[in-house]
Amino acid sequence: MAIGLIGRKVGMTRIFNEDGASVPVTVIEIAANRVTQVRTLDTDGYRALQVTTGTKKANRITKPEAGHFAKAGVEAGRGLWEMRLADGEGEGIEVGAELNVDIFADIAKVDVTGQSKGKGFQGGIKRWNFAMQDATHGNSLAHRSNGSIGQNQTPGRVFKGKKMSGHMGAERVTTQNLEVIRVDAERNLLLVKGAVPGATNGDLIIKPAVKA
């Protein structure tokens, strides 16, 4: 798995390409990712990089967190994330090193992972794109009802996984193969074509596309 970075969704805008076409882009701010721990096969049984980014008020840091950051010799960040490493990947990266947006300079497409916007409790029409029932012709109470949820005496139960009303959104979502439009190393910005999961200011994990 290729090394990724943690970023923050700034918002969406558009830019014009060389042909004058309008391209919708999402602006992702990727401040320096500081390496807090290097997982190895010998000590942990797998290879990975643990990173942090951003800042956190001193009075919001727990004692275990403070000790962990102090041991790594890096400034406390707003969270900790791990990136699994393939064999031979990430060699030479040590604790305290900084990873910046310029690692995407030669990358054409990326996968972006974030937490989707929460929608609360929603019905089947919004949650699963069910069709509405008749507006008239005898229907007076079930316009947005889900309809039948099963059979009769056989099997006599509702199958697991049946699409019904319930909580929608606020789950981990990955959007794959987003084209990298621009890498602005001076301002720590990455511009990708299209939308990415989550709300403005939400944390994102950006990795080179696995299906590119």
UniProtKB/Swiss-Prot annotation:
Keywords assigned by UniProt, alphabetized: Methylation, Ribonucleoprotein, Ribosomal protein, RNA-binding, rRNA-binding
Keyword Protein transport: no
Xref: Gene3D superfamilies: 3.30.160.810, Translation factors
GO cellular component, one term: cytosolic large ribosomal subunit
A Pfam family: Ribosomal_L3
Residue list for modification N5-methylglutamine: Q153
Keyword RNA-binding: yes
PTM section of the record: Methylated by PrmB.
UniProt name for this protein: Large ribosomal subunit protein uL3
Organism annotation: Shewanella halifaxensis (strain HAW-EB4)
Lineage: Bacteria, Pseudomonadati, Pseudomonadota, Gammaproteobacteria, Alteromonadales
Annotated gene: rplC
